[in-house]
Every structure is written in C-alpha cells, then in structure tokens.
Amino acid sequence: MNTLLHICCAPCANQCIDVLRGDHYEVTGFWYNPNIHPFTEYRARRNCLREYAATIELPLIERNDYGLRPFVRAVSQDIEHRCVKCYEFRLFEAARQAKEGGFDSFTSSLFISPYQNHELMREVAQRAAAEYDVEFLYRDFRPYFRAGQEKARELGFYIQKYCGCVFSEEERYLKKSKIVP
C-alpha cells in the first residue's frame, strides 16, 4: 500500500516514516503548512525536511504556499479555536492530494505530537477522507515522539519550539515572561 504522509517538520516525521516503512507502506511525504510563520521559520522547517528526505530517499511532494494571509483570515474570527482551522487547512489538502495522486491512504506526522489535540485531528482527518473518498490511515505515533526528538538532535535537525503559528509562538513567550496580554 502506498500512503501520503503529510509532514509538519522533519523532527516529527522521522519516526512516522520509520514506523510506516516498518509496516511495509510505501511512503511519500507531503509538505503543506500555511500555518507556519514567520517566513524564516517556514523556510527553516521546509529546508530541513528537504535535506532529510533526500538522505532517506523519501519522495516528497511540496506545496509551497506561504499562507500568512489566508491562515490569519481563517483563524482570526475565533483565535481560541484556531487549531481546528489549522488542522482543516492541512488535512483536507493532504486528503485531496492523496486522492488526486492515486494514493491508497493519507496520514500526518501531526499524530506524533503529545501537544496536539489528537481526537480533534482524527475527527478532521476522517471528514477529509470522506469528502475526498480516500482512506485515512490512523496511527497514534505519540509513543515515538521522544525517540524522534532524540534522532532529530543526533542528525542535527533544526528543532522548533512551537507548532508554527504566530499565536502559538506568542503563548510560548507569554508563559516564559508571565506577561498578561
């Protein structure tokens, strides 16, 4: 079976790829992350993934839409519930790409993060699968998160400190500084 793996970053993807390949899936990576800002962050994550994909012979499809304006427009009406829009942006596009590319299924490296809302992501991915009539391959990759971070450090990957959106970055700094917005 061939599956399209939506990839948020190389540190999260490395163990997902290993697990899927270990389960005999033919994996193709898919880069689409209009939520990642600023542009320097977007570029750092994308370039790290490109280099890693080349070293492990991972086919990689890139949709390089730096989407600051569409992303902010989509989430600005309800900042507190922005994650659902972010998941929809990426998982619906992954499902569409999987269907159009003739893949048997799709999944995402987002499912490795203990910091993401797993049930919400799963629900969004299932809706995307139904809309595009393609299988959503669910895997709970969270048990591999620490090993993936270790491997990323060993390989010298760029490792980010926030999910990618500017609101997440703001939260990270506000927690450290104890400043109230």
Label every model-predicted segment:
Residues M1-P181:
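Nucleotide-activated chemistry modules centered on ATP-dependent adenylation/adenylyltransferase
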